[in-house]
Amino acid sequence: MNKDHGCGHICKEAPRGSVACECRPGFELAKNQKDCICKYELSISEVGTAYTEVRKTTTGTATGIATGTCTGTGRVKATGRGTGTDTDTGTVTARATVTARVTGTGTGTATVTETGTAKVTDTGTGTGTAKVTGTAKVTGTGTGTGTGTGTGTGTGTGTGTGTAKVTGTGTDRGTGTGTGTGTGTGTGTGTGTAKVTGTAKVTGTGTGTAKVTGTGTGTGTGTGTGTGTGTDTGTGTAKVTGTGTGTGTGTGTGTGTGTGTGTGTAKVTGTGTDRGTGTGTGTGTGTGTGTGTGTGTAKVTGTGTGTGTGTGTGTGTGTGTGTGTGTGTGSGSGTGTGTGTGSGSGTGTGTGSGSGTAKVTGTATGTGTGTDTGTGTGTGTGTGTGSGSGTAKVTGTATTTATVTETGTAKVTGTDTGTAKVTGTGTGTGTGTGTGTGTGTGTGTGTGTGTGTGTGTGTGTGTGTGSGSGTAKVTGTDTGTAKVTGTGTGTGTGTGTGTGTGTGTGTGTGSGSGSGSGSGSGSGTGTGTGLGSGSGSGTAKVTGTGTAKVTGTGTGTGTGTGSGSGSGSGSGSGSGSGSGSGSGTGTGTGLGSGSGSGSGTGTGTGTGTGTGTGTGTGTSTVTVRGTGTGTATATGTGTGTGTGTGTGTGTGTGTDTSTGTDRGTGTGTGTA
């Protein structure tokens, strides 16, 4: 039969009549093997050591221990020994660990204060009683900012031709030719993307504050102008001046290149000696910019809360060709005024999608910048469109976590204090640059009128990635102060290239007093993104692959490459009228008209796009855990900077109109 002898003492009768005794938890048998005594004597023996976690009971309830008769676990009748020990442990790895174990009679409170650092103060007194007070306070603020800027420029040229023919029935004859030059406009694309991601995590009994601000701006401009003048003089009684002027202007975040030709024919017949005085105004309405396609693209992408601005403008100026024939007898002036209707399809595709998105989560600072520059040049007659798309993608991620946890038991008899201070900083930086070039040429021939268009588009995109992480590890024991500062830095770069080519020709033949016209158009499109793809007219095939892998722990690097190519060609001829088109993995257009003997069209397209992407992270973490009475506030800052670089080239030759688009994406990620 079991017998309870008090203080948790249980005796059991053994089979042989002997008595076997057991003690409840917290007690042990005395030497007489019949009585139970408490295992723990009241002493100052437990000294705080550093752990990976701070444990502290904010309100300790225990009783002073003395040798005597116990009435229950944790309860003691003190016999005059009231001094005790407080074990206080400092902070390790952004976590303050304090273990306070109290055995004694009294109440306890533990105080932990953290303001960007973890400071733990533990005070206890014991004189038969133990008192521990504690408060945990952690404050944290994080700010994230991301900016992106992209610029692009493009140039184009055009030609205008004026022809004057003079025939004098006299002694002298003169033939003059006037040539005018029309202007094309290049393409510039600026894209700014700002993406900011911040994370603030606060765990513990208390309050936390996280504030993140992100801004992204993308701007691109391109301008091109051109003029052409032609003067013609015939020696004899007939003097003819022909002037052809063509101008084309395209402006936008992307600008298009346009060229135009103007042909004016003036025929003067003079009867008699030294006559043939006819003003053959070879107005060849020098159509500058047949189709000035200005394509401006500003793309800003992000996720979350933030602001992003993008501006895209495109203007196109178009003129046409006109032919005039005038005949006069004597000093009659035959003015052949050719009005050229410039089909200025100013497609200025100003895709100014300023979707500048900034995603912010939590606390910290992430800053990333990306720059992309794409240039395209188109030369020839007709219209060339080049677009350089630069995309700057900035991703900044910063996480600050502050946690204070206080758990455990307090065994305190006496007084002790402890202080732990932790400081950690993480910085991530990534830089990248991107350039893109594009060239285009176009030719047009015809006894009547011929136009040629060339388009070149180049885009460059680059992405830089930087990652940095900082770790702060602090160990403090009891009375004392520990301060640790850690920094981490990481950089990453990314590059991308893309090429595209396109060709096209147009010819026209006219005879008699009529005129023949021929037009040709060429367009090219190529895209190369991290996994590049592209399209071109005629037959254009673009392939591009890009891979961006980023790993960041303390130090992170990221690289990305992308390439794309596109080519297109087309030709067309007609007797009276005709059309031709070329098709491929893109678009091809053919236009033909003849108000004379024949006309023909041809298309050519080439575009290339390259994209490189890199990613980096910078991380700074401060963790404090606290359980008990008090407030916890976490403060931490992290900075991440990412810049993207990409390059792309595109060339296109052809007639009439070509459109090319190139985009570049730069991604920078910074985490703190």
From Swiss-Prot:
This is Putative per-hexamer repeat protein 5. Residues 141-161, 171-191, 215-233, 243-263, 273-295, 303-355, 365-389, 425-469, 487-537, 553-617, 637-653, 663-672 have a biased composition (Gly residues). Gene3D superfamilies: Laminin. Residues 390-424, 470-486, 538-552, 618-636 have a biased composition (Low complexity). Transmembrane segments: none annotated. Residues 141-193, 213-672 are annotated as: Disordered. It comes from the Eukaryota. The gene is Phxr5. It comes from Mus musculus.
